[in-house]
Amino acid sequence: MRKRISAIIMTLFMVLVSCNSGGVAEDPKTVYLTSIANLGKGFLDVFVTFGDMVAGAFGIKADTKKSDIGKYFNDIEKTMTTVKKRLQDEVAKNGNYVKVKEVVDKFVADVLDKIAAGAKKQLRATGDAAIGMLLNEDAAPAEVASVNSLVKGIKEIVGVVLKDNEGDAAATKTADAEKKSVGKLLGKGAADGTETQAAAASASIGAITGADILQAIAKSGKAGAGEIKIEEAKNAAEIAAAKADSKDLAIDSAKKDAVIAAGIALRAMAKDGKFAAKNNEEKSANAVNGAAASAVGKTLSTLIIAIRNTVDSGLKTINEALATVKQEDKSAEATNPAEATTSGQ
């Protein structure tokens, strides 16, 4: 009798083990949705990187090297590549969820790839010198190819991360006389680049937003291959590449605070670009350097924040697609309980 009871108990135990083994097997759908839903945690380091870049951009000084500016763009490109790879790797493991794959593919093509391509164009455009200048150092035009590369790359990124109503390329608030005098920061005379002229440049930079500067760069035409005279400069690129000459800005399209700030930022970042400062006057050199550093810092910090916000928005869109897939799956199971039961075993 005991043997029969033992046999029955053993049989029941085996049945229970068999049932439970089917019950604990993880549903591939659930595994995929959970892994993607938790993917946001995997991007924490990405947003830490963005935070570091923003903090660094706010800390740009006159002695910051142009090559350090190039590193920001290199970091942007690498960050976009990292996000792209993580998303594509996860989708490749679970290719059955077409809706999610479509959203991811669109985000990669329309956002990540374009930002990466724009950032890549900046890598060789910056040079090794400091963005500011030394006491009694001569002004020098920025290399045309370098300026045009910066304009093209920033334009590509701005087209992705800023809406048309974000920033005004023609924004202007300061007096006409002040704006004209900024041309003297590019001059070669011993008295060019005074503290007063630097203050006029700083006023232009302070009067507008970083988005205004970015739009002025994005909407700037190219700097021509020939010698560019400051009094003939029409846009930010031409201000950046204008030859060292003691002239005022004269063309109306260039006498806009946003365009002036953009031209200063481009000249400071691009190869060979230097500003004038009154000879043997340290306060003027400091004022000019402060204006250059301010223009670059405002431009880069705004750009990086806009990229971060765009990436964050894209990841949220992917999460919204996941929520739709989950709801659809539940609805399908509710209308076909037999199939749902089979898939759970």
Swiss-Prot record:
<feature type="signal peptide">
    <location>
        <begin position="1"/>
        <end position="18"/>
    </location>
</feature>
<keyword id="KW-0449">Lipoprotein</keyword>
<protein>
    <recommendedName>
        <fullName>Variable large protein 23</fullName>
    </recommendedName>
</protein>
<feature type="lipid moiety-binding region" description="S-diacylglycerol cysteine">
    <location>
        <position position="19"/>
    </location>
</feature>
<keyword id="KW-0472">Membrane</keyword>
<feature type="lipid moiety-binding region" description="N-palmitoyl cysteine">
    <location>
        <position position="19"/>
    </location>
</feature>
<keyword id="KW-0614">Plasmid</keyword>
<comment type="function">
    <text>The Vlp and Vsp proteins are antigenically distinct proteins, only one vlp or vsp gene is transcriptionally active at any one time. Switching between these genes is a mechanism of host immune response evasion.</text>
</comment>
<keyword id="KW-0998">Cell outer membrane</keyword>
<keyword id="KW-0564">Palmitate</keyword>
<dbReference type="GO" id="GO:0009279">
    <property type="term" value="C:cell outer membrane"/>
</dbReference>
<dbReference type="InterPro" id="IPR000680">
    <property type="entry name" value="Borrelia_lipo"/>
</dbReference>
<keyword id="KW-0732">Signal</keyword>
<dbReference type="Pfam" id="PF00921">
    <property type="entry name" value="Lipoprotein_2"/>
</dbReference>
<comment type="similarity">
    <text>Belongs to the variable large protein (Vlp) family. Delta subfamily.</text>
</comment>
